[in-house]
Amino acid sequence: MAAVRGLRISVKAEATATTAEPRGPEPEPMEVEEGELETIPVRRSLRELIPDTSRRYENKAGSFITGIDVTSKEAIEKKEQRAKRFHFRAEVNLAQRNVALDRDMMKKAIPKVRLDTIYICGVDEMSTQDIFAYFKEYPPAHIEWLDDTSCNVVWLDEVTATRALINMSSFPDQEKPKGGENNEEKTAEKNKKEKQEESTDDETEEGEVEDENPSDIELDALTQVEEDSLLRNDLRPANKLAKGNKLFMRFATKDDKKELGAARRSQYYMKYGNPNYGGMKGILSNSWKRRYHSRRIHRDVIKKRTLIGDDVGLTPPYKHRHSGLVNVPEEPIEEEEEEEEVQDMDEDDRVVVEYRDDLQPFKQSRDRGAARRSSASASDSDEMDYDLELKMISTPSPKKSMKMTMYADEVESQLKNIRNSMRADSIATSNVKNRIGSKGLSDKVVDVRLLLEEKRQNNNGLRQPNSIVKSDVRQRLGKRPHSPEVKPPSSISAPRREPISDVHSRLGIPKQDVKGLYSDTREKKSGNLWTRLGSAPKTQEKTSDKPENSVASPEEDDSELQRVWGALIKEKGESRQKKSRLDNLPSLQIEISRESSSGSDTES
C-alpha cells in the first residue's frame, strides 16, 4: 500500500515570506513506513489566494510597446554615437531627456512598485476616453479606476511606462530650481564642447568616424535630489493640464487598489449618472439596485430565449423593448451584497449617459457591449451559465393542441357562446333598467304620424269601448287623468276616456268649444274621411246634429265636404301667419302639453 501523507497549509496575513531570512535547506524526508503520516508545509500569502476583482477598461484604439530599453546606458550611448556620426545636434529638451533609470534599484527601494503602471491623481470630471487621449503619445493598454480623483494607467511593458512618466512629468517644485541650475551648467558645457568639435571637424575627412571612448559620452545623470525623489516615489506634477486639472503622477504600487464602496460614494456617478444602473442619477438604494439586477437577469433570459427559440421549437411569450437610454453597458453586472460594508461595484466606467428619443444610438451601445462580452473574464461565463439555467427553468412547455375534433362539438361550443352572450346582454339590460327606472308609455316621444295612425285605429274601434287606447296629450306626458268635459247621464257606467285630439289641437289652434264638439252622432259615423280629417269645426256643428236614422244624400255630402275643406284651408293659413311651421317635433309636444295643462287648470 502507498504511504499516507498529510498536507499542512500555513497562510500568512502579509506577504513577508520574501523579506524573511532564508532558512537552511530542509532535510530530506526519511523513508516513510506504511500507515505513517508525512507533513508537507506549503507557504502562501493571503493576497495570492484572494482573486483580483479589479475591473480593467481596455484601450480600444490600441496600445504601444517600445520594444527596447531606451532608458538603459547602452541605448543612450548608441544614440549619442549615431548623432555624432551624422553631425546631428538636437535642441536641448528638458521634457525629453536621456535619463538612465536603474529599474533594479527602484525595485529594491520600493518592494511593491509596479513599473508598468502609473498612478495619477487629480482626474476629477475626466472620463476614461479623456485619460486615453491625454496619453496619446504613449498609448496605454488599460485603466484601473480607484475613485473619483485617482486611477492607475497600465502599459504592456515597463519601458513605455517609464518613458511616459519621465517625459510627461517633472520633478516637484521644491527641487526644481536646483535641478534647473544644474541643467543650465550642463548646457553651457555642452555648447563649449560643440564649438571645439566643430573646429576639429574640418580636419577630419568626410565619412570618417573618430575613435571615441564610450565613457566620454555624457548622459543626463540624475542629481542626488532627483534620484532620492524617484526612490521615494514622490508625486510628480504633469507638464500640461487636462481639462483644466493639474495632474500628479508616480509609479503605482500594489497597495493602490479600489476601496470598498467607492462606487456608492462616487460624486461623479451622482452628477452624470451611473451607467451600471441604467444611467440613474443621485443616491440609489439597495432595494432599487436589487430590483434592477432582477429585471436585468430577466431581460437577458428573454434575449437568449429569442435567440435559441427557433432551435428548441419555442416562441417567446412577448417581446421586450428597451428604453431610450444611450451608452448603457450590455454586459451582465455582478450582484452586490446587502451589507453596506461589503458593497463594492466592479463596474466603474466613466460614461456620460445621454437621454435621447431615437433608438439609433442605442444600437451602437449594443455593439460596444457585444465587443466587451468577448473580452470578459471567466466569471462572466459562470453568470451566462446561470442565465441559461434560469431560461430553461422559466421556459413554459409547448401547449398541446387538439388534433381530433367533431363537427357536433364545434356546433355545441358555438351554441354555448351564443347563450352566454345572450345572458350577458339580458343581464346588462336589466341592470340598466334597474339603474334608470322603468318608464311608462306616457314618457315616450310619439311621432305625429303615429298619432294619426292611432287615432284612425281608435275611430275604427269606437264600437268596442273596452279596446280604446288612451292617447291624450296629458296622458302621454304623465298628467293625472282628469277630463274637463261633462259626462252624459247614462245608466251604464262606461269607462271614462279622454277626448281624442283633433287636427286643431295638434296644430296649436285654441279650442273654441270643447263641450259641444263631441256628440253621440260623431260616434255613429263610419266614413273613413271623417276619421282621417278629425272632428268638424264650429260652423259645422249644426250639420252634425241630425237624427241618427237619417241618411245624407251624396250631394249634401259633397257640399259639406267642400265646406270642411275650405274651413281647413282657412285655418291652416291663419296658423301659418301666427307661427312658423313646426320643424322640431318635441317642441310641438311641449307646446301642446302647456295648452292642455292650462286648459285643465281653467276648467277645474
From Swiss-Prot:
Skewed-composition ranges (Acidic residues): 199-219, 331-349
Annotated region RNA recognition motif (RRM) domain: where? 116-177
What ranges does the record list as Low complexity composition bias? 595-604
> Where found, per UniProt?
Nucleus; Cytoplasm
Question: GO CC terms on record?
Answer: cytoplasm; nucleus
Q: Which domain of life is it from?
A: Eukaryota
Which InterPro entries does this chain map to?
NCBP3, Nucleotide-bd_a/b_plait_sf
Q: Using the UniProt annotation, give all residue ranges assigned to the region (Disordered).
A: 1-36, 168-219, 319-383, 457-604
GO MF entry, a single one: RNA cap binding
Basic and acidic residues: bias regions? 173-198, 350-370, 495-505, 539-548, 569-582
Name one process (GO BP) from the record: 7-methylguanosine mRNA capping
Which segment of this protein is annotated as the motif WLDD motif? 145-148
Ranges of Polar residues composition bias in the record: 458-469
Keyword annotations of the record: Cytoplasm, mRNA capping, mRNA processing, mRNA transport, Nucleus, RNA-binding, Transport
Give the family this protein belongs to, as stated in its UniProt record: Belongs to the NCBP3 family.
Q: Describe its function.
A: Associates with NCBP1/CBP80 to form an alternative cap-binding complex (CBC) which plays a key role in mRNA export. NCBP3 serves as adapter protein linking the capped RNAs (m7GpppG-capped RNA) to NCBP1/CBP80. Unlike the conventional CBC with NCBP2 which binds both small nuclear RNA (snRNA) and messenger (mRNA) and is involved in their export from the nucleus, the alternative CBC with NCBP3 does not bind snRNA and associates only with mRNA thereby playing a role in only mRNA export.
Q: PANTHER family per the record?
A: NUCLEAR CAP-BINDING PROTEIN SUBUNIT 3 (PTHR16291:SF0)
Assembly and oligomerization: Component of an alternative cap-binding complex (CBC) composed of NCBP1/CBP80 and NCBP3.
Q: What protein is this chain from?
A: Nuclear cap-binding protein subunit 3
Organism from which the protein derives: Gallus gallus (Chicken)
Taxonomic classification, please? Eukaryota, Metazoa, Chordata, Craniata, Vertebrata
